[in-house]
Amino acid sequence: MSSVSASWLDEVKWDDKGLVTAIAQDAASGRVLMVAWMNRESLQLTADTGIAHYWSRSRRKLWKKGEESGHLQTVRELRLDCDGDVIVMQIEQIGGIACHTGRESCFYRRFENGGWTTVDAVLKDPRAIYHP
């Protein structure tokens, strides 16, 4: 998935903090697994390595998805939306867990009967993932 020239990065509409929204979608099922942020460096690293890299706004640092948990995201395809301000990545989620809560997806709550209902089970206790 290597990029030949970095000029393609100029087509992305970065926000005032130099970030763009990035959606990770399971390549096989189409399910949205997570939404995060990318800066130029993380998007370039993602294109060059084929492994999803993000920018952590809370930690203010580059973040290779799965660097602590082992739940890497292998990128199959990168797409830029019509406005140039959202990236969608078709990914293979190694280990089947994308969410830090130990679930397949960060979108595990569904709006039902006027409130949020948890509809996806925890696949692995986060304490076992991050503090074995």
UniProtKB/Swiss-Prot annotation:
Catalytic activity line of the entry: 1-(5-phospho-beta-D-ribosyl)-5'-AMP + H2O = 1-(5-phospho-beta-D-ribosyl)-5-[(5-phospho-beta-D-ribosylamino)methylideneamino]imidazole-4-carboxamide
Keywords carried by this UniProt record: Amino-acid biosynthesis, Cytoplasm, Histidine biosynthesis, Hydrolase, Magnesium, Metal-binding, Zinc
Positions with a binding annotation for Zn(2+): 82, 99, 106
SUPFAM superfamilies: HisI-like
BP term (GO), one: L-histidine biosynthetic process
MF (Gene Ontology): magnesium ion binding; phosphoribosyl-AMP cyclohydrolase activity; zinc ion binding
Family membership noted in the UniProt record: Belongs to the PRA-CH family.
Protein name, as recorded: Phosphoribosyl-AMP cyclohydrolase
Organism: Chromobacterium violaceum (strain ATCC 12472 / DSM 30191 / JCM 1249 / CCUG 213 / NBRC 12614 / NCIMB 9131 / NCTC 9757 / MK)
Chain's gene name: hisI
